[in-house]
Amino acid sequence: MSKGKSKYVIDPISVKTACTSEESYIRCVEYGKGKAHYPNLSLLAKAILAGVFVGVCAHASGIAGGHFYYHKLREYVGISMSAFVYGFTFPIAFLCIIATGSDLFTGNTLAVTTALLQRKVSLLQYLRVMSISLFGNYLGAVSFAFFVSHLSGAYEKHTDVTKNHIFQFLNDIAEKKISHTFIQCICLAIGCNIFVCLAVYFVLTIKDGSGMVFSVFFAVYAFAIAGYEHIIANMYTLNLALMVEAKVTWSKVYFHNLLPTLIGNYIAGALVLACPLFYIYRNSYRDYERTRGDGSNCGLRSLSIEMQNGSNGN
């Protein structure tokens, strides 16, 4: 191999299973940078699709958890079984988003922010991507809540207590979500998006498909069962609760939950994770640029980085 063209040498084990920490950060920046090059309609379509996937799996999770909320069954297994089943079903949404390359706002708070900090996207591009992804996620999640969950009658309220367990499960979840104080909701949202952003980072780090699925599944399961607050999931759940006339109000939904959840999710991705990662690995990305060039814009799963060590002549 000619001088200056040798491959970047890493641990043989990591070649088979995972990237190094430096490579993971580089892939994260490149992934975030790539989003800035999509036209508005493409970004919106990808964001709507992600919102629909969250709605699909939140619907399934609510039905599955609601079946264990049947009043007689609840006396024997308790409400913890409903939470377990709900949390176990919901991570499928994130696997669908990864497989289709859809665009989720909460993951962008990490990836696109690292690209902004590395000056690979402008502030205007950053705001464009973040606002379109949030709006598209909202549109997809709320549309699914109305056209499928509400119009199908799956969460319809019944006067007969033996048939009302699905509605009651949704109602109790919604009431709990709007009962938090503003600060409590922000804190719960921070905890949530740490797990979600780590799930994105696992996809960028782990090369083995089964290992990636396993890691993402349990990262998302952890936040779902812990009762953390996720802005897109809450858009679906709380707007559906409004549609089926649960014990919630518009002002409580949007100002007591969705607003602080949005703030907390952003803090987690942009400040808790993106800023420290940038500080630790910013020079690794600069070294990568000097040896490789400007890189390429690829999808989350297909992004491939081949570092060259031309500076030391090895």
UniProtKB/Swiss-Prot annotation:
Residue spans, topological domain Extracellular: 69-78, 150-185, 233-257
Alphabetical GO biological process terms: nitrite transport
Record topological domains on the Cytoplasmic side: 1-47, 100-128, 207-211, 279-314
Protein's membrane topology: Multi-pass membrane protein
GO cellular component: plasma membrane; vacuolar membrane
Stated regulation of activity: Inhibited by the Malaria Box compound MMV007839 and its derivatives BH296 and BH267.meta.
Localization terms from the record: Cell membrane; Vacuole membrane
Spans through the membrane: 48-68, 79-99, 129-149, 186-206, 212-232, 258-278
Chief localization: membrane
GO function term, MF aspect, one: high-affinity secondary active nitrite transmembrane transporter activity
InterPro entries assigned to the protein according to its UniProt record, in alphabetical order: Aquaporin-like (IPR023271), For/NO2_transpt (IPR000292), For/NO2_transpt_CS (IPR024002)
Recorded catalytic activity of this chain's protein: (S)-lactate(in) + H(+)(in) = (S)-lactate(out) + H(+)(out); formate(in) + H(+)(in) = formate(out) + H(+)(out); pyruvate(out) + H(+)(out) = pyruvate(in) + H(+)(in); acetate(out) + H(+)(out) = acetate(in) + H(+)(in)
Domain of life (superkingdom): Eukaryota
Keyword Magnesium: no
Pfam families: Form_Nir_trans
Keywords: Cell membrane, Membrane, Transmembrane, Transmembrane helix, Transport, Vacuole
Role summary: Monocarboxylate-proton symporter that mediates the efflux of the waste product lactate in the intraerythrocytic parasites; active in acidic-to-neutral pH range. Transports L-lactate.
Family the UniProt entry places it in: Belongs to the FNT transporter (TC 1.A.16) family.
Subunit record text: Homopentamer.
The name this protein goes by in its record: Formate-nitrite transporter
Organism from which the protein derives: Plasmodium knowlesi (strain H)
